[in-house]
Amino acid sequence: MIAVKNVSKSFDGNQVLKNVSTIFETGKTNMIIGASGSGKTVLMKSVIGLHRIDAGRIEYDGRNLPDMKMSNIRTLRREVGMLFQGSALFDSLSVLENVMYPLEMFSLTSKEEMIERAYFCLKHVDLDEKAYGLAPSEISGGMQKRVAIARAIVLQPKYLFCDEPNSGLDPKTSLIIDQLISQITHEFNITTIINSHDMNSVMEIGENIIFIEQGEKAWEGNKDDIFHVDNEALNNFVFASELYKQVKKANQ
């Protein structure tokens, strides 16, 4: 569990997060949604530790991130998996080597065990073994995302952060990626946090949802309630997301 308590953050005198509080639960897909510029990305980066907050607490199972010593932060880094918007794979490495990379970086085990662990994770995301020796540029975008997921879980993380995981993917592939993230979250009991503006993803796998508007938590709840909320900003966001989806579908 990650508890965010009264977190505020400013850049050059501009307050982009204002006393945000929420709980990201273990074993559930927690989603941060909001329009561009709302502060949702700053919130995620603050929770990860990429931005130092001005006020508040970010507690990883009771451990307050801003108070941690560097040695404790290094330990925490091994507990965190990251799924970036653009997959962020190394094309100079094979698919298998990309998944092994975090294990090599932390020197946690033998070469044989690294390979075994990487194979386990790649099989877990249903990637064809024929792709293991290929460079990322030689496989499809959807397959690249599977590799990125495998790499994100290879350290057996307690916490998984996903930044717009469906960016650039077609609807069918997006659904597959959503289902993989949800499956991994529940099977391994991970605290998963997803930064997204994709309402399809929200309705498919969102369990705890926090809506950020102008740096504040404007609404929090579950997907069953999201279309029945008396909140103008949230309603406008949902409408805009649905409109964008229809326009995109019509142009395909």
PLM regions: where:
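Catalytic Walker B motif of ABC-type/P-loop ATPase nucleotide-binding domains
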Residues: 160-163
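Conserved ABC ATPase signature
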Residues: 135-139, 143
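Conserved catalytic motifs of ABC-family nucleotide-binding domains
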Residues: 156
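Conserved ABC transporter NBD signature motif
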Residues: 56-64
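Helix N-cap at the start of a conserved alpha-helix in ABC-type nucleotide-binding domains
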Residues: 171-173
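Helix-to-loop junction immediately C-terminal to a conserved catalytic motif
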Residues: 48
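Conserved ABC ATPase "signature" region
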Residues: 112-130
